[in-house]
């Protein structure tokens, strides 16, 4: 077993199940489990990607299998978000090949997507547009599954907290029961309870996950594979997160 997979199991074994008071029950987050697909879900061979025909990442040879939980490591500006966008179909390859399972559904979350929400609409209206055939009670139940209660669901997006916006984006990203979840800094606006709820939801999720985050607690409990994005390339990082963190500290001036 890879070192990070072993480290993750140890970290999970240390977690104690905490029973939350009823008033906090809405903090729970539930991701729907997709049907299993044959691996690989995604395969990239000799790929390069970037912006305006200028490559940011080159010589990409990557594979994502069903149930993989992958953390992208690397300094800011190395291309972690670029790789996330490529996997999420937000940008394309400049060279090489990218093949995906024909039935693959992808959910993508980025902290910058808050700009894509309609500020004068409520969370309920956002969901109603995405799921017009669902009954009012079904829509309320879906919102409740992401900790957005009846009162908050009727507030305009401009009036809800950053954490509630993040929950709404997570909900919209997972409506289609994605096989692959790509999450770029998902905990930035979440409070501690919501962060723990997200971790629990991701550890229970049966599909594949690709994570970009500075939250080492999240990464240590969710990821069992590490990819290092550095100097325009992406390669497996064979050590565990603790080794990576120690490596960063040693190299800091």
Spans of model-derived segments:
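An intracellular "coupling" helix at the cytosolic face of ABC transporter transmembrane type-1 domains
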Residues: 4, 18-20, 52
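A conserved P-loop NTPase coupling/switch region
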Residues: 1-14, 66, 235
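C-terminal boundary and immediately downstream tail of ABC-type ATPase nucleotide-binding domains
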Residues: 12-20, 246-253
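ABC ATP-binding cassette signature C-motif
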Residues: 25, 31-253
């Amino acid at each position: 077993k890879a070192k990070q997979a072993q480290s993750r199991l140890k970290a999970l074994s240390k977690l104690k199940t905490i029973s939350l008071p009823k008033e906090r029950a809405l903090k729970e987050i539930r991701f729907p489990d997709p049907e299993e697909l044959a691996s690989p879900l995604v395969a990239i061979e000799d790929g390069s990607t970037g912006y305006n025909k200028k490559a940011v990442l080159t010589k990409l040879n990557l594979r994502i299998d069903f149930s993989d939980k992958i953390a992208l490591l690397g300094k800011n500006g190395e291309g972690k978000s670029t790789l996330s966008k490529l996997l999420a179909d937000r940008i394309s390859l400049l060279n090489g090949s990218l093949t995906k399972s024909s039935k693959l559904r992808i959910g993508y979350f980025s902290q910058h997507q808050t700009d894509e929400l309609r500020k004068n609409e409520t969370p309920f209206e956002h969901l109603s547009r995405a799921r017009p055939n669902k009954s009012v009670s079904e829509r309320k139940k879906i919102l409740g599954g992401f900790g957005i209660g009846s009162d908050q669901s009727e507030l305009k997006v401009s009036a809800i907290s950053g954490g509630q916006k993040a929950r709404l984006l997570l909900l919209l990203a997972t409506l289609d029961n994605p096989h692959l979840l790509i999450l770029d800094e998902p905990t930035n606006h979440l409070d501690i309870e919501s962060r723990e709820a997200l971790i629990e939801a991701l550890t229970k999720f049966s599909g594949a996950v690709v994570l970009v985050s500075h939250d080492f607690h999240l990464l240590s409990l969710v990821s069992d594979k590490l990819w290092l994005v550095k100097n325009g390339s992406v390669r497996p990082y064979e050590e565990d997160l603790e080794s990576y963190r120690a490596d960063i500290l040693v190299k800091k001036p």
